[in-house]
């Protein structure tokens, strides 16, 4: 009996274990329905908010996606006949539709880029116009290059002709003129407008510098040098001396016509120099007097300042002595005065 009872209890336990086996379902996450605060709500899962499309483009894309998605049959019987479950068919259809959409988009982008690069989008008339325009531009550039080459070839020839024309004139104008050292100019640069004017003036008026300015000492020395030169020329050749004198007179006349004062009179220059020296001496005397006066005034002011300072000091001492006398003190000065009296 005991063995039967033990067998019966064993079988009952085994049956319970078999009946109460857990169903093999996919494990759920532990924290599936945990709020942000940390509190759990097992029965109420968080609802995800649907994002609205931001602009029209997004809406259009979403519409395209909905159109291209094939409709899934909702009848489970038909699916069962075909040997497919509803979940498996839905996932397959959705994946198929997304791949198609992506491929279509890629093809559209490739076509757009090709149309931008190539001229297929252009009409044949537009393409022909563009070709003609490019051809004209090339021809214009060729013509321009040829013109530039011709100009470059012609320029040196023109310069040579000018040099040949100007050379006889320069040979005629070149005469033996005495060198004036203060007018020598050396320059490797091309002649600008100022230099051209200067050269023209020299051609017309000559290279002799006019006697102008207020530096009378220098003018006198130049006059003496000119006289010495004339005497030397007269000793050698009177014709050259006369030519030199006529050139000097001609330059003086031209400068006077422009309104420039010519100071070539020796007596007047000496008188002007004396006047200038006299005025300079007078200025020096005035300056000396002024410096002496200013020094005397400064000394007087200093003396006055010292006297005032001494007076103030003496007044302070007298004030202190008077206070002491009022308090009943007898000062040595008072004793001396009493004995003297």
Swiss-Prot record:
Pfam families, alphabetized: SURF6
Q: Which UniProt keywords apply?
A: Nucleus
Q: Where is the composition biased (Basic residues)?
A: 46-59, 130-149, 273-284, 303-329
Q: Give the compositionally biased regions (Polar residues).
A: 68-77, 113-122
What's an example Gene Ontology biological process for this entry? ribosomal small subunit biogenesis
- UniProt subcellular location: Nucleus, Nucleolus
User: Is this entry keyworded Cytoplasm?
Assistant: no
Enumerate the GO terms in the molecular function aspect: DNA binding; RNA binding
Task: State where composition is biased (Basic and acidic residues).
Answer: 150-176, 285-302, 330-341
Family, similarity comment = Belongs to the SURF6 family.
This one is known as Surfeit locus protein 6 homolog
Which organism is this entry from?
A: Xenopus laevis (African clawed frog)
Q: What are the top taxonomic ranks of the organism?
A: Eukaryota, Metazoa, Chordata, Craniata, Vertebrata
Gene responsible for this protein:
surf6
């Amino acid at each position: 009996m005991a063995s039967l009872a033990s067998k019966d209890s064993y079988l009952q336990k085994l049956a319970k274990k078999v009946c109460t086996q857990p169903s093999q379902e996919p494990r759920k996450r532990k924290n599936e329905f945990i709020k942000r605060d940390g509190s759990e709500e097992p029965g109420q899962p968080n609802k995800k908010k649907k994002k609205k499309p931001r602009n029209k483009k997004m809406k259009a894309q979403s519409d395209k996606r909905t159109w291209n998605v094939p409709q899934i049959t909702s009848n489970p019987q038909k699916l069962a006949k075909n040997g497919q479950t509803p979940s498996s068919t839905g996932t397959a259809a959705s994946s198929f539709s997304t791949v198609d959409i992506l491929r279509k988009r890629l093809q559209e982008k490739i076509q757009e880029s090709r149309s931008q690069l190539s001229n297929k989008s252009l009409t044949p008339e537009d393409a022909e116009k563009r070709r003609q325009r490019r051809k004209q531009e090339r021809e214009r550039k060729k013509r321009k290059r040829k013109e530039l080459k011709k100009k470059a070839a012609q320029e040196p020839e023109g310069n040579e002709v000018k040099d040949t024309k100007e050379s006889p004139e320069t040979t005629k104008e070149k005469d033996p003129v005495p060198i004036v050292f203060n007018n020598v100019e050396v320059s490797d640069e091309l002649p600008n407008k100022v230099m051209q004017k200067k050269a023209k003036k020299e051609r017309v008026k000559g290279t002799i510098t006019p006697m102008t300015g207020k530096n009378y000492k220098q003018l006198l020395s130049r006059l003496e040098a000119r006289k010495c030169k004339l005497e030397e020329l007269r000793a050698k050749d009177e014709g050259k001396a006369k030519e030199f004198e006529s050139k000097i007179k001609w330059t003086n006349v031209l400068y006077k016509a422009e309104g420039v004062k010519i100071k070539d009179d020796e007596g007047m220059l000496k008188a002007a120099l004396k006047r200038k020296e006299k005025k300079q001496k007078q200025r020096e005397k005035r300056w000396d007097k002024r410096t002496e006066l200013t020094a005397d005034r400064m000394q007087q002011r200093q003396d006055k300042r010292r006297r005032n300072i001494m007076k103030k000091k003496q007044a302070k001492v007298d004030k202190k002595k008077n206070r002491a006398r009022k308090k009943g003190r007898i000062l040595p000065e008072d004793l001396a005065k009493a004995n003297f009296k």
